[in-house]
Each structure stands twice: as structure tokens, then as C-alpha cells.
Curated annotation (Swiss-Prot):
Belongs to the ClpX chaperone family. SMART domains: AAA (SM00382), ClpB_D2-small (SM01086), zf-C4_ClpX (SM00994). The keyword Zinc applies. One of its GO terms (biological process) is cell division. InterPro entries: AAA+_ATPase (IPR003593), ATP-dep_Clp_protease_ClpX (IPR050052), ATPase_AAA_core (IPR003959), Clp_ATPase_C (IPR019489), Clp_protease_ATP-bd_su_ClpX (IPR004487), ClpA/B (IPR001270), ClpX_bact (IPR046425), P-loop_NTPase (IPR027417). Component of the ClpX-ClpP complex. Forms a hexameric ring that, in the presence of ATP, binds to fourteen ClpP subunits assembled into a disk-like structure with a central cavity, resembling the structure of eukaryotic proteasomes. This is ATP-dependent Clp protease ATP-binding subunit ClpX. Keywords: ATP-binding, Chaperone, Metal-binding, Nucleotide-binding, Zinc. ATP-dependent specificity component of the Clp protease. It directs the protease to specific substrates. Can perform chaperone functions in the absence of ClpP. It comes from Treponema denticola (strain ATCC 35405 / DSM 14222 / CIP 103919 / JCM 8153 / KCTC 15104). Zn(2+) binds at C12, C15, C35, C38.
């Protein structure tokens, strides 16, 4: 029993010691009680055994080859980008798990810059790597960020997203990965210093520089702007990996202007911009090119690894629809299966969907919206039709509002 019959004092059910001036005992249901000291012991026990980092110091970090193999299951194409990212992530966590001793060489962070068109897989690559490493992951849109004191999001709000995705565990968040999308949109308006404030350009780059290189940041727990006397969350960004991505429209012309030279001698040829692959040009990007584009030199120096992504071809988009573990068509087939519908896509239909994404210039990002629009009526009708059903998608239905997919009932007896 929790209560001593003789003295009437509560007794802790765990340590069997009575309530006193130095021991507070809280009664619970069923005659159970616990003292404040046992509560403290339980809290210490939970904290000591709680797993805050799936990646531990035992050295069991996935190798670059294992990371790439995992990426291959979810991401089609972009072989060079996969290899570069796999090595960068491996080296980053290897560096964390082996902190330098006194007088040791200090290894700097391997932050990554991804250059590639919209829908080429930049976000998916970063997200899939974080999934494999089992670390918190956050996506930030650079276009929403503004310099402190102006309308918009503070840079620190990026860190708040990471903390929230780590369920409030600061230590776990400090091992996470942040993907900053559309980093090219915060380029300063010109190479010359302007007399007017560039609140969403160079000022944001300066603010990003601090958290990317590693600092102890103060984050408002509820988001928004900082206020005096407000309690702040403290987070060290030293071990957070930053992957930045952008389309960098116009950067190819800057690179072309630098590498193009006048022909020397008879028969000399100069490869024109129209004849060069965009990825081929991005592979030759130098820090000076990025400075001319509008990024500040200090920020470029903190993102040492740069890799170009290929523009996805129709063949790539066709494979994306059917091959990955979570391929879009596989997802829709599983969804329709729950309503007892067998969904099939003709090969020509899949190719037509890929071509439509190319025509719309949306890349892989636009594939899902195309299929969603195509399947809307069928998804609306399927739950109301009883029995085993079939739905076949052919080429004529793609982009043709007059030829909509229709569900066929296979077993009339069950209808």
C-alpha cells in the first residue's frame, strides 16, 4: 500500500521510504505512489538511454558506395551528383564521429552546392540521403528569407524547422541536414555595392554565412521575429550539413564568356553556346563565375563542393514514373488497389506523360500533378463502384479532356 496505516504517511512504492519534510510523495491510481527522488532517477535513466543519434561513434557510417546504392533505389539518373553527394555526406559524418584532438588537423565541413534546372532532383537527393542517415532534415526556400528587421522570414527560422523535425531534440537537430532551395534567387542585384538596401539578397547571404560556417544561434521557439526578453533555443550549427540548390539561370552565359576564346590559326573552331550541354558548362563553374552571378565570395567559400545536375530527358522521366521504390505510378496503383481497382498504364501512355512534363518545362516535379489531374475523375468514382474493377490508361487519354479514363467492372456478380 502507498499509505502507512500507523502514521498515515504516504510511502513511495519504489524505494519504500515514507513522505517527510525532505521527501515529497505523489499518490497515484491503485494505491501506487512515487517520491520526487525516484522521479529524478527515472528522468536520469531515460535521458541516459535515449537514442538521440542513429549515427553513433561506433564507426558504422554507411559507406559512399552504400549511400549511392540507396540513392539508386529512389533517384533516376544524376550518376555524378549521386557519387559526389555520397562522398560528401560520408566525409561529413566521419568528421563528426572523429573529433580532432589537440594539435590535430581540423577538417572543415563539406557543404554542397547543386546546380541544375527545376525538377532535376536536387531536393529528392538531399531528402533521400537524410532518410538513409536517419537524421533530421529540413527544407528552406531562400526566396522567403529577408534581412533581419524587414518583412519576411529570419534565417534562424530555417533552424527552427530542423528542431521541429527532430521533435524538439536540439542535440539530434545539431546532426541534421538542411536543404536550402533556390539559393540563386538571393544573389545580389549587381557586383557593385548599392546605396539602397538589398533586403532579400546580399543581406540574407551574410546571415546565411554565419549559420553555414558554424555558430551558436538563438532561435525563437515559436518562429517569427525575435523579441526582447523572449526565451530562445540555442543550437550549434557546426555539425549541420548544408546542401544548397538552384537553377542559376544565366550562369551558363557567364561561364561561356569566360571559357570562350577567339580562334587562333586556320581551321580553329569555337564551340558555340547552343552546341554545349548546360551540364557541361556548369561543370566548369568557378568561384569567380558565382561572384559575377551575385553570390558573395565568403558564402561561396563555405560551400566548397559544387556539382551540376543533368537536365532530365524523356527517357529519364519515363523511368522515374515506373522504376523507383516509390515511383508515382506504383503509388497510384497501390491507392486504387485499396478500392479494388487494377490500374494499368500502356507504355505509350507513360511516354506521353513524360513528354507533357518536358513540354511544360517542369521536369520530374511536374509528373505527379499531370497524373493527379489525369486520374481525378477515376479516383472520385472508384469508391462508389462495388466489385473488382479495372482501369487502363492509354496514350489517347493524356492531355485529352474528351477521352477520360473510365473504370471497367470485371465481376458483374459482385456489383
Amino acid at each position: 500500500m502507498a499509505r502507512n496505516r500507523m502514521g498515515g504517511a504516504l510511502i513511495c512504492s519504489f524505494c519504500n521510504k515514507p513522505e517527510s519534510s525532505e521527501r515529497f510523495v505523489v499518490p497515484g491510481p491503485g494505491g501506487i505512489a512515487i517520491c520526487d527522488r525516484c522521479v529524478d532517477l527515472c528522468e536520469s535513466y531515460i535521458k541516459s538511454y535515449k537514442t538521440v543519434r542513429p549515427v553513433d561513434r561506433s564507426g558504422a557510417i554507411p559507406t559512399p558506395q552504400e549511400l549511392k546504392e540507396y540513392l539508386d533505389e529512389y533517384v533516376i539518373g544524376q550518376e555524378q551528383a549521386k557519387r559526389v553527394l555520397s562522398v560528401a555526406v560520408y566525409n561529413h559524418y566521419k568528421r563528426i564521429m572523429n573529433p580532432p584532438l589537440e594539435n590535430d588537423v581540423v577538417i572543415e565541413k563539406s557543404n554542397v552546392l547543386l546546380l541544375g534546372p527545376t525538377g532535376s532532383g536536387k531536393t529528392l537527393l538531399a531528402k533521400t540521403l537524410a532518410q538513409k542517415m536517419q537524421v533530421p532534415f529540413a527544407i528552406a526556400d531562400a526566396t522567403t528569407l529577408t534581412e533581419a528587421g524587414y518583412v519576411g522570414e529570419d534565417v534562424e527560422n530555417i533552424l527552427l524547422k530542423l528542431i521541429q523535425n527532430a521533435n524538439g531534440d536540439i542535440k539530434e537537430a545539431e546532426m541534421g541536414i538542411i536543404f536550402i532551395d533556390e539559393i540563386d534567387k538571393i544573389s545580389r542585384k549587381s557586383e557593385n555595392v548599392s546605396i539602397t538596401r538589398d533586403v532579400s539578397g546580399e543581406g540574407v547571404q551574410q546571415a546565411l554565412l554565419k549559420i553555414i560556417e558554424g555558430t551558436s544561434a538563438s532561435v525563437p521557439p515559436q518562429g517569427g521575429r525575435k523579441h526582447p526578453n523572449q526565451d530562445m533555443l540555442k543550437i550549434d550549427t557546426t555539425n549541420i550539413l548544408f546542401i544548397c540548390g538552384g537553377a542559376f539561370v544565366g550562369l551558363d552565359k557567364i561561364v561561356e564568356a569566360r571559357i570562350s576564346t577567339k580562334p587562333i590559326g586556320f581551321g580553329a573552331e569555337v564551340k558555340k553556346l547552343s552546341e554545349k550541354n548546360l551540364t557541361e558548362l556548369y561543370d566548369q563553374v568557378s568561384p569567380d563565375d558565382l561572384v559575377k552571378f551575385g553570390l558573395i565570395p565568403e558564402l561561396i567559400g563555405r560551400i566548397p563542393i559544387k556539382v551540376a545536375l543533368n537536365e532530365l530527358t524523356k527517357e529519364d522521366l519515363t523511368r522515374i514514373l515506373v522504376e523507383p521504390k516509390n515511383a508515382i505510378i506504383k503509388q497510384f496503383q497501390a491507392t486504387f488497389k485499396l478500392d479494388n481497382v487494377d490500374l494499368h498504364f500502356d507504355k505509350d501512355a507513360i511516354t506521353a506523360i513524360a513528354q507533357q512534363a518536358i513540354d511544360q518545362n517542369t521536369g520530374a516535379r511536374g509528373l505527379r500533378s499531370i497524373v493527379e489531374k489525369l486520374m481525378l475523375d477515376a479516383m472520385f468514382e472508384a469508391p462508389s463502384i462495388k466489385g473488382r474493377k479495372e482501369l487502363i490508361i492509354n496514350k489517347k487519354m493524356i492531355g485529352n479532356s474528351s477521352s477520360k479514363p473510365k473504370i471497367k467492372l470485371l465481376d458483374e456478380k459482385t456489383a
